[in-house]
């Protein structure tokens, strides 16, 4: 299969440019400049929160071929598990997408259908501390806020949960895969 990907960041396009089978386009979800009815599937992976849902849905409907499918994917820590929920609260990681709240794109799509997949990512406490530094709340925070979050994470992982440095921790994740067909397609 071939992939056409739309990315507004020149740096991100450059970083991903070596991925085989992908043609990168400068643009945004609301105005892709891609041709009408040219794609069987349009997917937003970890990006739906960045777009205007109405306009991005209308644009997806425009570029989808008849019978085309819109997909919206979220990978997130499984916050239904209490210790994971607390971990995400400390990291302020935004793992808040719920199965009972389907996305609402514009563009005349049939109701969203959900497939949910559980999986685990094995990480050490040190890798979780690094993961915390990738969250937008950390990046936007003051130095004092960053230090506080890292200190809270160290306390939670090492003292409260009792993990040792370098020890493997199986982090439960859930992937929410929403899909909808164009109405009347």
Regions found by a protein language model. Give the residues of each.
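Conserved SAM-binding loop
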Residues: 5, 40, 72
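Tryptophan-centric aromatic hotspots in well-structured domains and transmembrane helices
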Residues: 1, 32, 48-50, 74, ...
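Class I SAM-dependent methyltransferase SAM/SAH-binding core
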Residues: 1-32
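Conserved catalytic/acceptor-binding region of the Class I
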Residues: 55-123
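Conserved Class I S-adenosyl-L-methionine
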Residues: 104-185
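Short conserved AdoMet
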Residues: 17, 52, 65
């Amino acid at each position: 299969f071939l992939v056409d990907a739309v990315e507004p960041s020149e740096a991100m396009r450059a970083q991903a440019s070596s991925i085989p089978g992908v043609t990168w386009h400068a643009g945004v979800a609301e105005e892709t400049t891609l041709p009408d009815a040219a794609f069987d599937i349009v997917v937003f992976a970890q990006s739906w929160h960045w777009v205007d849902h109405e306009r991005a849905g209308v644009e997806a409907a425009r570029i989808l071929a008849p019978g085309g499918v819109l997909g919206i994917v979220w990978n997130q820590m499984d916050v239904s598990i209490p210790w994971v929920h607390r971990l995400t609260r400390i990291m302020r990681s935004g793992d808040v997408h719920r199965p009972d709240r389907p996305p609402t794109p514009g563009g005349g799509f049939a109701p969203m259908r959900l497939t949910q997949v559980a999986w685990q990512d094995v990480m050490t406490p040190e890798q979780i501390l690094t993961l915390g530094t990738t969250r937008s709340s950390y990046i936007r925070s003051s130095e004092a806020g960053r230090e506080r979050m890292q200190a809270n994470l160290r306390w939670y992982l090492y003292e409260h949960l009792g993990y040792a440095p370098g020890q493997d921790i199986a982090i439960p994740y859930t992937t929410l895969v929403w899909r909808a067909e164009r109405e009347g397609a």
